[in-house]
Structures are given as C-alpha cells and as structure tokens.
Amino acid sequence: MNRMDNYPKRYRIVTLAENLVYGRGLQAEHGLSLYIETPTHKLLFDTGASDLFIRNAAQLNIDLHDVDYLVLSHGHSDHTGGLHAFLELNSRATVVCKETIFDRKFKEVRENGILEGETIDRRRFRFVKEQTELLPGIFLFPDIPLLDAVDTHFEHFFVMRTDHRVPDTFEDEMALVLTDGSSFSILSACSHRGITNIIRRVREAFPTQNFRLLQGGFHIHNAENEKFDSIANYFEHDCPQQIAVCHCTGVDKYALLQQHFGDKVVYEYTGKMIEIP
C-alpha cells in the first residue's frame, strides 16, 4: 500500500481568533488561532493573544478537550497568549514547536514572547528541528531558508541572546502543511521569514503536487511597496487555487491582493470555515 493512501482526503479549518469578526456571538482580537480537523485527528495552530479562542470555540460547538496536537508557529504573544489556558483546559494534547520558541522576544523595547514561559511543563512539548510528518498528510516545516531577502519581516523585532538583545530572524518560526497526496495547502501564521520563502521550501518537498490553499498572515500590513510587490510578483507564476489572508496581512493589503488575483483571495476572519477539498 502506498503510504499516501492513508492521507486524509478532507480537512476542515476554522478560524477561532483573528483581528476581525462578523459572526454573531464571536469576538476578535489581535492574534491568530486556527482549528484543524481531519476524519481521525484534531489540531490547533496557535492560541491567539488570550483565552478568547476557547470562548469562540464553544460558540462554534468545537470541543477543544479533544484536540490531539497544538502546533505553535512562533513565540510571539499574539500567537501564544492562550497557551496557559489551553494547557489547563486540555490535559492530553502534545504541544509541537521549535525549542527556540521560549527565547525572550521584544518588539522595540516591549517584551512580546511567551508569558511566564518558565512555569510551563515542557514534558508536554515535542520539539522539532527539521521537516516532520506529524500525522499522515500533516507536515511541519521548521527549516525555512531566506532565499528572498526582500520578503522578510524582521524590522523592530529583537530576541535575547545571553545578556543582550539582537535582531530577531525568527529561528523559531514554523509552517504547517496539509496534503491529500495530490495537492498541498500551507498554513503560515505570520510569515516573518517570508511567505514566498515558505512556499519555495514546501515546493521542494512536494514538487509534483498542486498548490491548493495558502492560508494565514503575510506580515505586510505596514510594509513598503517593495515587499508587497515581491510577494505579488511571485504569485504571478506560482499562485495557489485559493489565498486566505488574515491577521498581519492587513485589510489594505488584502484589498490589493484581491485587485491582483480576484476571487482567489478571501479574508479569513474569526469564525470562517474552509474545507479541503
């Protein structure tokens, strides 16, 4: 039997927390949390800035007690702020991330990494360093090369090294990929190391598969035109069937992307559900 025969043929992705909201009874915050469901497993990708994702999940009739894995994209507080609340709620899930996620992080002078990271029970964590198949059809990409230096988003961010701060190049960042064996979808929370760099890395792993969905934040809401143009130009020759933007992409850049690529581009607001296929 081909191992790809075990890959899920259906994925459901629900945005539990994001900057915007339209659904009645839901709330928004500056952060991101995605719920991913296959016929056999349930995952969480980031926890937003607070426990809001838990409250929104309840409104959406999603039981987070059943989540098998929590994948953390990087250490910023708007993606890990609900970590403590999740670990209290769910006693069984394994947390998967890079070990450098616990490094102290800053935006300018303000600390914005994992809150009270020293109090977290790391026995529940699984640290990854290289491409990893977490579950059949679900891959982690923690090794993102900086092939396009223009499409990087490090400005104003720092990380603590020994006793001093240095510019943060986001060694802790990781992307999540879902595949059914014939097409792949990329979930990237903030893309500090560049969404086009992430795509190139995933393309190396799945060179013959179709590019089904690109979902997440591109960190271009305040970016200069050169950075936006670098991404748009890349999509001209390698564009997924659907681009679901959110969070740090910015509504203005969402509108610009839609001008370029039309109905392929949608906004991934709080409460939105995307199904694959």
Predicted regions and their residues:
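Cap/insert and terminal regions of metallo-dependent hydrolase folds
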Residues: H76-H79, P167-S185, C190-T270
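Metallo-beta-lactamase
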Residues: T100-M174, V266-P277
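Glycine-rich phosphate-binding "P-loop"
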Residues: D5-R24, E155-P167, G216-I220
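Active-site metal-binding loops of divalent metal-dependent hydrolases
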Residues: A17-L20, T47-S50, G75, T100-I101, ...
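Structural motif
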Residues: Y11-V14, K42-L43, Y69, A93-T94, ...
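Conserved N-terminal glycine/acidic-rich loop preference
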Residues: K42-F45, L64-V67, H79, R104-K129, ...
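Active-site metal-binding motif and surrounding structural segment of the metallo-beta-lactamase
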Residues: L52-I101, E204-L213, C239
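Conserved beta-strand hairpin/beta-sheet module of binuclear metal-dependent hydrolase folds
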Residues: K9-L60, T169, E173-S188
